[in-house]
């Protein structure tokens, strides 16, 4: 009788383990089906930039499978000049529309000193949530290649699931 009880408990534990594994797998499939995914579309220097700051308007497109909510780009990001020395680029204004449905663009406006060179690599990070409130971040590497602010994407940043 004791042996049967032991086997029964082992079967129950194995069943419980399988159910938990199936549940995790289903949750991951659901998460991936809702995951927003930003791609860099373009950037340009805004012509009404004041005399001390250069204003850079950057556009990203949500090409994921779900909407992105509570979009918050970093307040600052580090940029590297061609000689590998660093300077800071700051967010110039608050996000005008913190929601990007699939196929919609999201605009981020940054600024940096007018004295900086026109050729540099920046690494902005964008944080956002999906439909279920899961938090993500995506860090891009973008080369600004001329005085007009035209950008070239260097990496294909994947959304990373953030810990709470």
Which stretches of residues belong to each language-model region?
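Membrane-proximal alpha-helical anchors
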Residues: 1-66
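Short, solvent-exposed loop/turn segments enriched in Ser/Thr/Gly
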Residues: 51-57, 105-106, 121-122
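Serine/threonine-enriched low-complexity regions used as flexible
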Residues: 118-133, 137
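Beta-strand elements of well-folded, non-transmembrane domains
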Residues: 62, 75-79, 126-132, 144-146
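Acidic, serine/threonine- and proline-rich intrinsically disordered appendage/tail regions
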Residues: 131-164
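Generic structural motif
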Residues: 34, 38-43, 47, 73, ...
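Intrinsically disordered, low-complexity Pro/Gly/Ser/Thr-rich segments with frequent PxxP/GP/PP motifs
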Residues: 78-116
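Short, hydrophobic/aromatic beta-strand segments
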Residues: 65-75
């Amino acid at each position: 009788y004791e042996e049967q009880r032991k086997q029964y408990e082992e079967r129950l534990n194995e069943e419980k383990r399988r159910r938990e594994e199936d549940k995790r797998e289903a949750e991951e499939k659901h998460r991936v089906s809702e995951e927003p995914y930003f791609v860099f579309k373009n950037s340009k220097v805004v012509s009404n930039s004041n005399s001390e700051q250069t204003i850079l308007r950057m556009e990203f497109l949500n090409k994921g499978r779900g909407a992105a909510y509570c979009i918050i780009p970093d307040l600052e990001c580090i940029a590297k000049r061609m000689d590998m020395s660093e300077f800071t680029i700051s967010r110039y204004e608050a996000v005008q529309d913190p929601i990007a449905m699939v196929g919609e663009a999201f605009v981020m406006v940054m600024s940096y000193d007018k004295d900086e060179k026109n050729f540099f690599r920046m690494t902005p990070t964008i944080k956002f949530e999906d439909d279920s409130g899961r938090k993500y971040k995506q860090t891009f590497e973008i080369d600004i290649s001329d005085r007009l602010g035209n950008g070239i994407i260097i990496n294909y940043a994947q959304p990373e699931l953030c810990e709470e």
